[in-house]
């Protein structure tokens, strides 16, 4: 009977430890996600650094424009 009690306690400790480890990993992933999102630049920053084209500039695809919309080979206003 004592062996069974010890085994049950050991199993409970292992399950608890596993749950704590998984919880810690989840917090790390949340921080990574927040860091990824905070690294994004605003439209104004992208335009200022020349990473996208402003309104009425020649374009061939949507990602080239700060507004994200290339229509009839020119960037839309927004």
Swiss-Prot record:
Propeptide: 20-38
Subcellular location: Secreted
Pfam families on file: Conotoxin
Keywords associated with the record: Cleavage on pair of basic residues, Disulfide bond, Knottin, Neurotoxin, Secreted, Signal, Toxin
Disulphide-bridged cysteine pairs: 52-66, 59-70, 65-75
Tissue: Expressed by the venom duct.
GO cellular component: extracellular region
A GO molecular function held by the record: ion channel inhibitor activity
Coiled-coil intervals: none
First and last residue of the signal peptide: 1-19
Domain observations: The presence of a 'disulfide through disulfide knot' structurally defines this protein as a knottin.
Assigned protein family: Belongs to the conotoxin O2 superfamily.
Record's protein name: Conotoxin TsMEKL-P012
């Amino acid at each position: 009977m004592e062996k069974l009690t010890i085994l049950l306690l050991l199993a409970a400790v292992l399950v608890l430890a596993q749950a704590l480890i998984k919880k810690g990993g989840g917090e790390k992933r949340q921080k990574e996600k927040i860091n990824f999102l905070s690294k994004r630049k605003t439209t104004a920053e992208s335009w200022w650094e020349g990473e996208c084209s402003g309104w009425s500039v020649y374009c061939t695809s949507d990602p080239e424009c700060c507004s994200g919309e290339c229509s009839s080979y020119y960037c839309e206003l927004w």
